[in-house]
Amino acid sequence: MARQKDPAVRTQLLERAARMLREREPITLRSLVEGTGVSTMAVYTYFGGMDGVWRALRQEGFTRLAARFETLTVPDDPVEDLVAGVAAYVVNALEHPDLYRVMFDATVELEDVEAAEATLQYLVRAARRCREAGRIREDLDPVLLANEVWTVSHGIVSLVVSRVTSRRTLASGIPLLTAVIVAAGDDPAACRRSVEAGWAALRPPQGRTAMASTSTT
């Protein structure tokens, strides 16, 4: 009778690989399992080899992003909803910078392309709500707006994660996103209020350790 796979072993190896990326350690079959208590055979059992490890790492970034989206409470304000979505994207990148980098490594195949692409649909749905509520022009494609706000957030957090700029740069998300959504047809004052609310929605309460992950200072 074949032994059942233990999900904890798979998670352990993925987390070790992510940690090795963070510490700039070369990842090989032997170095990956070193100190884990499992043999090199586990890499083949759970991933089919090192190529599978890289695919799983890339997929894991999208999996965690999707899980974060699932925790969001949908507000009545559709613009706040849209911005809260990209704020969640930013926080996910800040909390998992190594997985974030691998997410966009096109040289590595994804395990589930559709699941990865589905993460964008959260933003598309929110952008569609904006149009239905009359906050943006009726002739504007929600997919276009979703891509525009994602591009802004991706650019900002990429600079921060790569340490080109400090976390103070995150504060620029408010005026930049406001400009994008106002250009799409929203009222400037209402838009600013909604963007500020959405951008702040993912900040943990004061006193929690996670506060450091979302601080703009």
Mark where each language-model region is:
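Generic hydrophobic, amphipathic alpha-helix propensity
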Residues: A8-A17, L32, L57-G61, L65, ...
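Hydrophobic alpha-helical connector segments
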Residues: E70-L99, P142, A146-V149
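Helix-turn-helix
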Residues: Q12, M20-G52, A56
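Amphipathic alpha-helical linker/stalk segments
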Residues: Q59-L82, E114-A118, R129
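Amphipathic alpha-helical segments used for helix-helix packing
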Residues: L94-L110, S158-S162
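C-terminal peripheral helix-coil segments that are non-catalytic and often amphipathic
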Residues: R125-A133, S162-T217
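Alpha-helical DNA-contacting segments of helix-turn-helix folds
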Residues: V53-G61, M103, T119
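Amphipathic alpha-helical packing segments from all-alpha helical-bundle domains
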Residues: E109-R135, V143-T151, P175-T178
